[in-house]
Each structure stands twice: as structure tokens, then as C-alpha cells.
């Protein structure tokens, strides 16, 4: 047993050493890449208006710039501080990932609940229907979920007749109502996805924006009651975050230097 323990420990040490080497190599490559990009594109460009005029005698009510005949737009460039450059670069990368995962999640979040409701345990009356359902779904999972639902329903009936409504009763109620809750969440998520999509189209993709839409809705709700607009805004933001998580779980991706795998 002791020799085996030393063998396992040695194997882990070897893996740990290789992992540290990979981390050092990855950090070195990232530092070199960031330094190169900062040296090449680490500038901030500002569009300014250039005014030029001849020199005139200055009085209390006259400035030479007011009589200038040329108005030229030019660009002024300056070296950006390294922290500002890092923030801007990370913002660009996060915006791309946010757009990808959020777009996928807005579709998968309601669809996953729709499929969960569609594949819920159903009452099987004939042998032909039973064979058809078992051919389309996993037999073990369906039978287990159906038995659990049947047992919970019978337990509810017994406890309701006996007047006992403890923790077990509430747990069984939750199991029985889970399918209906899934359908209600599906309708809610689908509505939120459609509203977000409409807002992106009419306010962000159209230039100039055609209509403020959600911005105006939040303002009106906030004027109706102090916390109503804030609460609604928080719900929409929370749904957007959940959409990004759902998109990452279903999509996953492989970048140039690292991989982002679907979560489990």
C-alpha cells in the first residue's frame, strides 16, 4: 500500500509539473502578444476640429478665432495608459463572447424548457402506445420519472386525506407541479427572448434608433412606481445573464490559445 501511494504521488507530481510548464508557456505567449499589440495599436484617437485664422488685435468683444474661415476635422492621437489599454482590449473580447453566447442562449433557454415539457412522463394506455414511446425515448429514464410522479401523487392523496402536510407533502407537491412550472417558465422565457430581440432590432441595429422601446418602458414603469422600473430592469438583466450561461453550456468554443468547453 505504501509503495502504491508513493507511485500515485509521483504520478501526480509529474502531471503537476507539466501543468505548471503549460501555464508558464501560456503566460509568456500572452505577455508577448499583449506587449506587441500595445506597441502597435496602443493609441487613442480623438476627432477634433481645427480652427485657423490670422492674428488680429484682441479687444474685449473680439477673438481672432471667431473670424476664422477654415473649419477642418482632424484626428489627434496619443499613447493610451497600459491599464486603459488592457480594459479596452478585454472589453472588446468580452463583447464578442457576450454576443455569441447571449444570442445562442436566448434561443436555447426557452427551447430547452419546451423539450423538457414535451418529453415529460405521460400516461400510457395501450401496449402500442407504450412501444412507440419507448422507441423514441430512453426507457429507463421515462419509467423512473413516471414511477416517481405516480408515487408522489398517491402520497399526496393519502396525506391530504389524513390532514398531514409536512415537509414530505410539500416535496411531493413540488414534484407533481414541476411539469406545469416548466411550461410556465417556457412561456415567460420565450416572451423575454422576443422582447429582447425586438429591442435589439429597433434600438441598436437601426441607425438612428427607430424607437427607444425598453428604455421608454422602464422610464414609464419607474414613473408609475418607484421600484417597478428598477425591478423590471433587473429581471431583464438577470435573464440576459442566464442566456449567456445557457449559450456557453450549449455552445462551447475553441480559441487560438485556449478552449472553452460546454459546461456540465
UniProtKB/Swiss-Prot annotation:
<keyword id="KW-0812">Transmembrane</keyword>
<dbReference type="Pfam" id="PF04791">
    <property type="entry name" value="LMBR1"/>
</dbReference>
<feature type="transmembrane region" description="Helical">
    <location>
        <begin position="23"/>
        <end position="43"/>
    </location>
</feature>
<feature type="transmembrane region" description="Helical">
    <location>
        <begin position="194"/>
        <end position="214"/>
    </location>
</feature>
<dbReference type="GO" id="GO:0016020">
    <property type="term" value="C:membrane"/>
</dbReference>
<comment type="similarity">
    <text>Belongs to the LIMR family.</text>
</comment>
<dbReference type="InterPro" id="IPR006876">
    <property type="entry name" value="LMBR1-like_membr_prot"/>
</dbReference>
<feature type="transmembrane region" description="Helical">
    <location>
        <begin position="225"/>
        <end position="245"/>
    </location>
</feature>
<feature type="transmembrane region" description="Helical">
    <location>
        <begin position="96"/>
        <end position="116"/>
    </location>
</feature>
<keyword id="KW-1133">Transmembrane helix</keyword>
<protein>
    <recommendedName>
        <fullName>LIMR family protein SELMODRAFT_416716</fullName>
    </recommendedName>
</protein>
<keyword id="KW-0472">Membrane</keyword>
